[in-house]
Amino acid sequence: MARGCLQGVKYLMFAFNLLFWLGGCGVLGVGIWLAATQGNFATLSSSFPSLSAANLLIVTGTFVMAIGFVGCIGALKENKCLLLTFFVLLLLVFLLEATIAVLFFAYSDKIDSYAQQDLKKGLHLYGTQGNVGLTNAWSIIQTDFRCCGVSNYTDWFEVYNATRVPDSCCLEFSDSCGLHEPGTWWKSPCYETVKAWLQENLLAVGIFGLCTALVQILGLTFAMTMYCQVVKADTYCA
């Protein structure tokens, strides 16, 4: 009976971790594709230049693949050490995500202030050598969200030391349109515009976060259940 339960949990554990590993492969693949085709796309922070979409996806994908691999081998080999390692790693990830979420909501005002200051510092790197990712990211954000600057289009005046903005701030794009009158530029601040967009899509973000948490809890349950079954089977055989 104990052996039959163990086999059932074993196959469920293996299937779960195989999907987990394949998901990591997909995330890693997207990260590598972004790095190869878009450079350091979406690098907006001057304090953390390596914090790009591509790098985040590559690190996340690699870590998920590693955890999934440990889980798969642990399930196939019915290895208590690997199963416990998988459980501990996944539990640490879950606790880290929960801690980050709590801190984010607890210090949202301070994070807002710091983020705006850091983004304004990053504006000074716009268009400079070695900062193609930051330049592309700002151009895309200002064009797609129809905004200009972090808190105001005048943020760019300090960057250029002139009454000028990037061409991506223009209502109607044309070469050197950023040198025209302010009436031809977008007036909405990018930080508040993007923040409002995220708040409008908060339900989707919440559902994604909830699904992620449920998957992790499922993985923890499978791992601990199988670990206990392996211990019982070993005791029964002894």
Curated annotation (Swiss-Prot):
It is a multi-pass membrane protein. Keywords: Glycoprotein, Membrane, Transmembrane, Transmembrane helix. Gene3D superfamilies: Tetraspanin. Residues 1-13, 77-85, 223-238 are cytoplasmic. The chain crosses the membrane at residues 14-34, 56-76, 86-106, 202-222. The keyword Membrane applies. It is found in: Membrane. The gene is Tspan4. Its main location: membrane. Glycans are attached at N152, N161. It comes from Mus musculus (Mouse). This is Tetraspanin-4. Forms a complex with integrins. GO terms for biological process: mitocytosis; regulation of mitochondrial membrane potential. Belongs to the tetraspanin (TM4SF) family. Residues 35-55, 107-201 are extracellular. GO terms for cellular component: membrane; migrasome. The keyword Transmembrane applies.
